């Protein structure tokens, strides 16, 4: 993988080779052989993107030339004209002021990301692939065939040797109970919140909005109530607890916080994303439910948002867009990730999350719908024109030989944070969006180092890019997440400043970032103990 931190978007010189005699009687080089198509496309992109400036230059030149010919008499005549129309000028000025005031008071409030923090568990909670298989075998519930099935999944998952499991499941025998689940939730959430409050200097009493998402663990009192109690948040806080919304719920929480910040002036919003493993380790033999055991790991993140204009100078990012897609009206999409009791004849009643075989196809449809909505908001005009021209050629003129045009999102974003749901998901998105290994590196390394941490994985990926020193002022980052329902959600962030890795003391990658990226084999054999 490339360590180059600058994207390869600059044109390169055209080289023409004359090794063979040129059959062209005019001695002109065959540019079809010498010009790479992607650079022609890049030049077209630059031309269309700057078309407005090119068109305005002659108008500006003509205006300057006209103004330069103004004399004192011309200015005197203009003054006299305005003086005799004083009332009209006054009304026009008042109207302009009124319209400006209306615009500034009704426009959406800008939402800034002050900082975020990802929880890094204690080294004692590291779960190697061998440890996972050992604990699975010691439980005494899984059949030999299903133990072999889990080992096969794990060997191909892309997970490394330093992912984390909760203490209750590492014990022999394991102790999955409500008390241990609460302990895991508190450890992860409070650890992430402590770090983000310390980094930003924001006091708990200043937080006016709290949004917590955890899909499978929803105790009473809620997780959000646990945070209010721990940090003694104020009594009129707007508190929300989102459950059952899958791995995409982190961006749903961001969108909800954004909506609340539009109507709550001068407020801070704390968003906490996590998942609980302790009570959701499936102890049965339904294979559709065993995949979750193999890839989900312990983790969480806390994000602090603000709509205060004074916070812009110290914020890292500005939230530009959020786009949410819900395919739940389709029965197949609704049931492709489904929590239920297993149907094993020998051991019924074990609850797990079943993943259907058509999950990838459904995720692809959800992604297509999402980017169709997002594209016009972020893509440069050059890409939109190419897409429209291709669509007209295929649909209107019935030119079937032309393939559907996939917009180049690398022209809209410098960084991609794709939910580390599994190797197959990342492979498909890399292929469909034509992304490079460099673009996919944060997602693949997060999957390798931390596993699938559900909704918080996007923040481990952004933290990776920060630790690598990749985030520069003005850079745009696209976060994409998938979740049960079935949902696909996107968030677009713009960096307000260059992130210096040396300032990121609590970044979960910072003490080992030089060890990455690592080569992840397609199959990593697990050595038996």
UniProtKB/Swiss-Prot annotation:
- For the keyword 4Fe-4S, the answer is no
> Keywords on this record?
Acyltransferase, Membrane, Transferase, Transmembrane, Transmembrane helix
Catalyzed reactions per annotation: a very-long-chain acyl-CoA + malonyl-CoA + H(+) = a very-long-chain 3-oxoacyl-CoA + CO2 + CoA
Q: Which GO terms describe its molecular function?
A: fatty acid elongase activity
Instruction: Show the segment(s) annotated as Disordered.
Output: 1-22
Q: How does it sit in the membrane?
A: Multi-pass membrane protein
Q: What InterPro entries has UniProt attached to this entry?
A: 3-ktacl-CoA_syn, ACP_syn_III_C, FAE1_typ3_polyketide_synth, Thiolase-like
List each copy of the FAE domain by range.
103-396
Superkingdom is Eukaryota
Summary of activators and inhibitors of this protein: Inhibited by K3 herbicides such as alachlor, allidochlor, anilofos, cafenstrole, fentrazamide and flufenacet. Strongly inhibited by metazachlor and only slightly by mefluidide.
The EC code for this enzyme is: 2.3.1.199
Looking up SUPFAM superfamilies in the UniProt record yields:
Thiolase-like
**Loss of function: phenotype:** No visible phenotype, but reduced root growth. Kcs2 and kcs20 double mutants have a glossy green appearance due to a significant reduction of the amount of epicuticular wax crystals on the stems and siliques, a significant reduction of C22 and C24 VLCFA derivatives in aliphatic suberin and a roots growth retardation and abnormal lamellation of the suberin layer in the endodermis.
What does the record give as the function of this protein? Mediates the synthesis of VLCFAs from 22 to 26 carbons in length (e.g. C22, C24, C26). Functionally redundant with KCS2 in the two-carbon elongation of C22 fatty acids that is required for cuticular wax and root suberin biosynthesis.
UniProt record similarity statement? Belongs to the thiolase-like superfamily. Chalcone/stilbene synthases family.
Protein name, entry field: 3-ketoacyl-CoA synthase 20
- Species source reads Arabidopsis thaliana
Gene designation per UniProt: KCS20
């Amino acid at each position: 993988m490339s360590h180059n931190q600058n994207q390869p978007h600059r044109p390169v010189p055209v080289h023409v080779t004359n090794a063979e005699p040129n059959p062209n009687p005019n001695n002109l080089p065959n540019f079809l052989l010498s010009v790479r198509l992607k650079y022609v496309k890049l030049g077209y992109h630059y031309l269309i993107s700057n078309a407005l400036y090119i068109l305005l230059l002659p108008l500006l030149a003509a205006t300057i030339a006209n103004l330069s010919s103004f004399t004192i008499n011309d200015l005197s005549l203009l003054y006299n004209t305005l003086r005799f129309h004083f009332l009209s000028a006054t009304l026009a000025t008042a109207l302009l002021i009124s319209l400006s005031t209306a615009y500034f008071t009704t426009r959406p409030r800008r939402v800034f990301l002050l900082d975020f923090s990802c929880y890094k568990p204690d080294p004692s909670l590291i779960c190697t692939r061998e440890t996972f298989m050992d604990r699975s075998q010691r439980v005494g519930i899984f059949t030999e065939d299903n133990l072999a099935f889990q080992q096969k999944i794990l060997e191909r998952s892309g997970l490394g040797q330093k992912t984390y499991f909760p203490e209750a499941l590492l014990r022999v025998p394991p102790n999955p109970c409500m008390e241990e689940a609460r302990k895991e939730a508190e450890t992860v959430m409070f650890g992430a919140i402590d770090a983000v409050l310390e980094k930003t200097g924001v006091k708990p009493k200043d937080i006016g909005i709290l949004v917590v998402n955890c899909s499978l663990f929803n105790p009473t009192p809620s997780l959000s109530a646990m945070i209010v109690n721990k940090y003694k948040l104020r009594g009129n806080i707007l508190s929300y607890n989102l459950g059952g919304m899958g791995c995409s719920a982190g961006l749903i929480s961001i969108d909800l916080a954004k909506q609340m910040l539009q109507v709550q002036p001068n407020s801070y919003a704390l968003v906490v994303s996590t998942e609980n493993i302790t009570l959701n380790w499936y102890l049965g033999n339904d294979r559709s439910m065993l995949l979750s055991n193999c890839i989900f790991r312990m983790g969480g993140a806390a994000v602090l948002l603000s709509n205060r204009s004074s916070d812009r100078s110290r914020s890292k990012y500005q939230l530009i867009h959020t786009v949410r897609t819900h395919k739940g009206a389709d029965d197949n999409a609704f049931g492709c990730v489904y929590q239920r009791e297993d149907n094993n004849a020998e051991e019924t009643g074990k609850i797990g999350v079943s993943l259907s075989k058509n999950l990838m196809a459904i995720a692809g449809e959800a992604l297509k719908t999402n980017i169709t909505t997002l594209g016009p908001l972020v893509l440069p005009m050059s890409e939109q024109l190419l897409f429209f021209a291709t669509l007209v050629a295929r649909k209107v003129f019935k030119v079937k030989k032309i393939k559907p045009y996939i917009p180049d999102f690398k022209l809209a974003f410098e960084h991609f944070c794709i939910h580390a749901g599994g190797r197959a998901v990342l492979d498909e998105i890399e292929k469909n969006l034509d992304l490079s290994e460099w673009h996919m590196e944060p997602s693949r390394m997060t999957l390798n180092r931390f596993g699938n941490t559900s909704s918080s994985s996007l923040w481990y990926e952004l933290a990776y890019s920060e630790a690598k020193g990749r985030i520069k002022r003005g850079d745009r980052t696209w976060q994409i997440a998938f979740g049960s329902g079935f949902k696909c959600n996107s968030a677009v962030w713009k960096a307000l400043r260059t992130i210096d890795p040396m300032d990121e003391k609590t970044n979960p990658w910072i003490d080992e970032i030089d060890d990455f990226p690592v080569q992840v084999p397609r199959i990593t054999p697990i050595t038996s103990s």
